[in-house]
Amino acid sequence: MAASKDVVVDIQKMSLTFQTADGPVYALSEVDLTINKGEFVSFIGPSGCGKTTLLRVIADLERATGGDILINGVSPQQAREDRSYGYVFQAPALLPWRSIERNVTLPLEIMELSKEERLRRAHEALKLVELNGFEKKFPWQLSGGMQQRASIARALSFDADLLLMDEPFGALDEIVRDHLNEQLLKLWARTNKTVAFVTHSIPEAVFLSSKIVVMSPRPGRIIDVIETDFAKDRTLDIRETPEFLEVAHRVREGLRAGHSYDD
């Protein structure tokens, strides 16, 4: 399987089955997906549909049991070893005894970069998420939204072109979430990174994305891929426009079509 230089993630007929004491669990089935350089791609679907599992396969945190997957033309394992991506988890996962600056530099210490390079990258990443001035603060001194921005800065410090984000704003209230959505969109526009983003929120998926991947209940399959054409400098006001509502309606209809209410 060969990948174009503009293809960042290339998935073909990929499946994943977990073996358990109660028998096999079919998590993903026959997934085909291409993510191109500079795209913001959201995965949306019901709980348990495999959104996070798919992201973890891309990150080499889970191994596919069938099909093919390439990240920048190499295997997920090689991409992980090459540090080709940054990963933002659902919770900030900041170490409480380390300052924000030292939380951001932690993976860079593991990479054995020089102190000067670690600090340069950390300060640059914190500036991108508008946390410059908070370098010496500790996680408990920051709000939940600010902690998640610090987590994003840590992922950005790798200076990788691919950013993987697993429901990073899911635990935040709606107003804070809206603010961080706008900040993330500005960050994407400035850096032109490729983003794969897991969410349960239809408005969030539509607002952020250039491509929306709608998934079915387990076993997770892709039932629709919706491309948007909104301006990169869009604001939250776009959510009231007919164009936005039309895309949101298509996402909702895709989720309804793939959902079972037999439980």
PLM region spans:
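The feature captures the beta-strand-to-loop junction immediately N-terminal to the Walker
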Residues: 44-46
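Conserved ABC transporter NBD signature motif
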Residues: 67-77, 121
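Short coil-to-helix segment of the ABC ATPase nucleotide-binding domain corresponding to the Q-loop/switch region
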Residues: 98-105
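Hydrophobic anchor residue at the start of the ABC signature
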Residues: 152
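Conserved signature/switch motifs of ABC ATPase nucleotide-binding domains
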Residues: 137-140, 158
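Conserved ABC ATPase "signature" region
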Residues: 105, 109, 116-134, 186
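Helix-to-loop junction immediately C-terminal to a conserved catalytic motif
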Residues: 59
